[in-house]
Each structure stands twice: as structure tokens, then as C-alpha cells.
Amino acid sequence: MTARQPDPRLSPGLAAWLDDHAGALDDGSHDAAEVLPRLAAAGVFRLGVPAAHGGAPGTDIGDAIEAVSQVAEHSVAAAFVAWGQRVFIEYLLRSPNAALSQAWLAPLLAGEVAGATALSNAMKFLSGIESLQIGARQDGAHWVLDGRMPWVTNLRKQGFLVAAAVSAPDGTPAVVALPHDIEGLTRSADLDLLALQSSNTAALDVRGVRIDPQWLIHPDARQYLPQARPAFAGLQCGLSIGLARRALRAAGEAGQGQASRGILGEPLQALARQLDEATARLVDGVRSERFVAEPWLLFESRIALAEIASQAVQLELQASGGAAYLKPAGDGFARRWREAAFLPIVTPSLVQLKTELAKRRARLAAEGAA
């Protein structure tokens, strides 16, 4: 039993390549530099981008979420790269800095330059969870930046732009873009992750980086990020959707389909329905922009989809039995198990989101009692 499959958008060639290299992309034995051009050549990043900017006509953000989901069915490492790239493109589409968008959208869509989002810190800043990690001081017409970004994905060694939130000289939180070769920006070695190793994930040190207004994505993150957050989190949810679909399909096929006909049949069908319903709610909320005014509904969707993915992998294990624990037969399951472990901790983590929802419930209860 599997969740409903939408009209296919992922090219057969890309799907086959991802299947062939999923294990190597997870453990880092395949060159991470190849992922971005492969995704770009298949048109993954053009979905949901206006045709006037080089996008695929007749598509919207829901199609972009679906594209990330379908990549994640084959490789969450590749989907993580797709998420970072497509979110950065979304930042430029929403930026009032038209010159910045015009200069960089084409190479980003073509996969010639990587786009990295380091705005997780800013998302937590908006919720009062932590302070901004990069400060700016005025020096004539320039800002001079200092700070650190401890975990950033899609920092392709061949060239990248990274979006970062900074505390402007007047204290306003702003969003800027930094090119990989700007003086004072230093990329660490790749982080030694448990999984998703071919995702070009590293840390960035920012020491005396001088920028002028041409690199400003938006002057006020408090206005900008609530508008961008639904796309940021919605595309991120594609990781959970795709992984859940693949695990449910594997569970249904285990033992020549015996699991789906036996005691696990009902749980598999129920979870597939939950996945379809949660996916539909997510896409509808992002498309309608309801999540801009009601972000707590977005948080609930993110939590629900990550938990569904975890349950799906558990069902795959139960359906596969001991075969899932043997190499090489269980390699695909083992990778999905590690991928599922990542979903609760990617920022905003489930703990952070549940904390925010608990604060909201407490506030509403206090207001009701007043």
C-alpha cells in the first residue's frame, strides 16, 4: 500500500541516476559537485518560478514542493540540495533588489551557481529562540560583517551564494547575500554528518566581510521572512513527504506484498491516507498564503509530516523483518532510517516548533481566562 502518486514530474533519467547513486550520495563516496547540475538539467529548480524569470510556465510553488518530494523518494541527500537551491531562488524572487535577482537567477536556475540558505538562525530569531549570529558595523557606504554560520547546506566548492541574516548597524535584522569568493568568508571542511554527506554541508566564518547595498536581499527580516517562511518550510517538508512515500512503497512490496495483505495492511493504508491529507493541507496552505497569517498551521504540518515519515520507516522495518538488517539487502532501508533521523532536527526542529505551539496554547488559555 502506497500513498497516492501525483502526475510524474521527475525525469526518468534523473530518477534512475538518483537510485543508482543514493547510497553513495548518503555516505559521501560520490562527488557532491555532480548533484546540482543533475537536478538543474532535469528542470527541478524552474518549477514554480514565473516564466518571465526563466521558470516553467503554468507551475506554482505547489509544483516546486512536489519536485523536492519526488527527489526525496530516491535520495534525501539530493532533495536537501534541491531544497537549499530552490529556497534561495525563492528569496531572490521575493526580494525588492531587482538588480540582484536579475544578475543571479539565470545561473541559479541552470545550476551553475549554488544557492545556500543560512536563514535558519533568522527563523529562530523571529520566534525569540536565539539572537542573530552575524553583526554588521558601518564603514562609509559599506557594512562590515563578523560572525559565524555553523551549519549551511549546498556550499558547493565550485561556487555559491549564501543568504544570511545580519544585525544591521542600526540594530535592524537584515537579509544579505554573500558570494563564495568575497574576502573574509571562509568555508570549513564538510561537516562529518551521520548521513546526507554529499550535500556540501559545512560551516562559514565571516570575518571583516565588506558589502555594499548591491548584496542586500531585504533591509528588514521582520517584514521579509514571515512572507518567505511558508515556501522555506513547505519546500523543506518535501523531504518528509518523499521519504514517507518511498518507505510506504517498500513496506507494501516487502515479502512480495505479504505485509500489505496481512496484519500491517490496515496501518499501511491508514498512514498512506494521513500522508496524502497532510500533504494536501501543506500545499494548500502555502499556495493560498494562509500560512503567512497563521504560521502555527505551518508548524503543525511540518511536525505531522516528519512524524509520518518516521512511522513509515518503522512500518518498512516491520514489513521487511530481518532482511532489513542484513547487508546488502537492507542498505536502502538503513539509508532511509538515517534519513528519517535527520527530519526532526533540521531547523526549525520539531522540539522548537512544539515549544512555539505550546507557548501559543498557553497564551490563548491565559487570554481566555482573563
Please describe what each predicted stretch is:
Residues 235-294:
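Extended amphipathic alpha-helical segments enriched in small hydrophobics
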Residues 19-27, 256, 275-310, 314-328:
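C-terminal helix-coil-helix/basic helical segment that borders enzyme active sites and/or dimer interfaces
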Residues 31-41, 45-146, 153:
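Glycine-rich flavin
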Residues 182-210, 221-224:
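Flexible, small-/acidic-enriched active-site or ligand-binding loops
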Residues 242, 269-276, 299, 303-310, ...:
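Generic structural signal for well-ordered, non-transmembrane alpha-helical segments
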Residues 151-185:
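A short core secondary-structure module
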Residues 205-233, 247-259, 283-286:
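A glycine-rich, basic-preceded beta-loop-alpha segment at the flavin cofactor/substrate interface
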Residues 322-370:
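Glycine-rich phosphate/cofactor-binding loops in nucleotide/flavin-utilizing enzymes
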